[in-house]
Curated annotation (Swiss-Prot):
Changing W40A: Loss of autoubiquitination. Disulfide bonds: none annotated. It comes from the Eukaryota. One of its GO terms (molecular function) is ubiquitin protein ligase activity. Pathway: Protein modification; protein ubiquitination. GO terms for biological process: defense response; protein autoubiquitination; protein ubiquitination; respiratory burst involved in defense response; response to water deprivation. It is found in: Cytoplasm. It comes from Arabidopsis thaliana. This is E3 ubiquitin-protein ligase PUB22. The lineage of its organism: Eukaryota, Viridiplantae, Streptophyta, Embryophyta, Tracheophyta.
Length: 435
């Protein structure tokens, strides 16, 4: 764009400072670009006007057609300067159109497929459409499709071989039915994820009055779905658990933890791996879930991930992994599994002072847990030889947080009789060993 062209200030969105493509008016009377104000209100979860700081009482956005036409005319007049005319935006979907679409979908499988494809298109257009879909109870509609489809291909008849059926025709029909159900499930799951459902709607899905247990359904998908659907299932499960009540989290079934660990093992996608770790962070503060997670092989999996440079190179991954290890090592089964892994002590010790303050604090807590409750002569010698004791002494010398220093000092004092006079502690660190 030529620098000599001056853009009228009222053409610019107060948030993005770019020319508005779809100007809309909020309840305070200020005009913004639709995409920017939707992101501010819905993704940012703010309820105030960025310009006036007044509370936005109504989230309905009124299109400013006059300003939009004025911007389009200005763009046309200045086309010779390389300014492109902004297209006329599509109007947001209305609730009646959504309800009609859902009603028509119940008439046949083909209409259901068409409905899901249309919903995907609607979701991709703008955030207002997403809120309209939510108001029309589309999340519940999609969850029911997913649940019913999963029940179909998980039904007992799905395990029958063709020899158990009356003839080959029946076998082919059954196979087609399962393929159709899986295809519907994959499409509905994708739309449900991209809908970016609000916290209120997520809670409604968790407490579905129609009896659909979405958590169980997503667990089954993580077990048997295609890679993309397994990833979406993990992402949705994380969102659901973030708004779940403590009792709902405590009552989670053992199978869920096994599938979460499998997601971590398969490394389906960066987002799926991150969500699986977040699920463990959300669920493992409760004792029952710690036992389930340990039985599912969580500790071994996390140690292996921490040894993987691709995973551990991201600070947040290392932090979450160490938080989960800390929680699991607070139970006896967790400490036993931790010590059963030959590289556990070395891997955890290596993360101290190398990633972040959170990682260092949690790593020291893990070492304190095993050092306090599982201190055998061989373990204490291993910690000496691996440089754990020297690392703990170093923690006392550097700036790394008072909590971390307190835990390190506690562990060093606990085994001072064995460690204090050891030649494995470098002389430059010896003076920091607590008395």
């Amino acid at each position: 764009m030529d620098q000599e062209i001056e853009i009228p200030s009222f053409f610019l969105c107060p948030i993005s400072l770019d020319i508005m493509k779809d100007p809309v008016i909020v309840s305070t009377g200020i005009t913004y670009d639709r995409e920017s104000i939707e992101k501010w209100l819905f993704s940012g979860k703010k309820n105030s006007c960025p310009v006036t700081k007044q509370v936005i009482t109504e989230t309905d956005l009124t299109p400013n057609h006059t300003l939009r036409r004025l911007i389009q005319s200005w763009c046309t007049l200045n086309a010779s300067y390389g300014i492109e005319r902004i297209p006329t935006p599509k109007p947001p979907i209305c609730k009646s159109e959504i309800e009609k679409l859902i009603k028509e979908s119940s008439s046949s499988h083909l209409n259901q497929v068409k409905c899901l494809k249309r919903l995907r298109q609607i979701v991709s257009e703008n955030t207002t459409n997403k809120r309209c879909l939510e108001a029309a109870e589309v999340p519940e509609f999609l969850a029911n499709i997913v649940s019913n489809s999963v029940d179909t291909y998980n039904s007992p008849s799905s395990s029958l071989s063709s020899s158990n059926l009356n003839d080959m025709c029946q076998s082919n029909m059954l196979e087609n039915r399962f393929d159709s159900s899986r295809s519907l499930m994959d499409e509905a799951l994708s739309v449900l994820y991209h809908l970016d459902t609000s916290e209120t709607a997520l809670k409604s899905l968790l407490n579905n009055k129609k009896g659909t247990n979405l958590v169980k359904t997503l667990t089954k998908i993580m077990q048997r779905g295609i890679y993309e659907s397994r990833a979406y299932a993990a992402l949705l499960l994380k969102k659901l658990l973030e708004v779940a009540d403590p009792m709902q989290i405590i009552l989670l079934e053992r199978e869920l933890f096994g599938e979460v660990i499998q997601i971590l093992h398969d490394q389906i996608s960066h987002k799926a791996t991150r969500s699986a770790m977040q699920i463990l962070v959300i669920t493992c503060p409760w004792g029952r879930n710690r036992h389930k997670a340990v039985e599912g092989g969580t500790i071994s999996m996390i140690i292996e991930l921490l040894m993987d440079d691709t995973f551990s190179s991201e600070r947040r991954n290392s932090e979450m992994a160490m938080v989960v290890l800390d929680m699991l090592c607070q139970c006896a089964e967790g400490r036993a599994e931790f010590l059963n892994h030959g590289a556990a002590i070395a891997v955890v010790s290596k993360k101290i002072l190398r990633v972040s303050q959170i990682t260092s604090e949690r790593a020291v807590r893990v070492l304190l847990s095993v050092g306090r409750f599982c201190a055998t002569p061989s373990l204490l010698q291993e910690m000496l030889q691996l440089g754990v004791v020297a690392k703990l002494c170093l923690v006392l010398q550097v700036s790394c947080g008072n909590k971390t220093k307190e835990k390190a000092k506690e562990l060093l004092k606990l085994h001072a009789r064995v460690w204090r006079e050891s030649p494995c502690v470098p002389r430059n660190l010896y003076d920091s060993y607590p008395a």
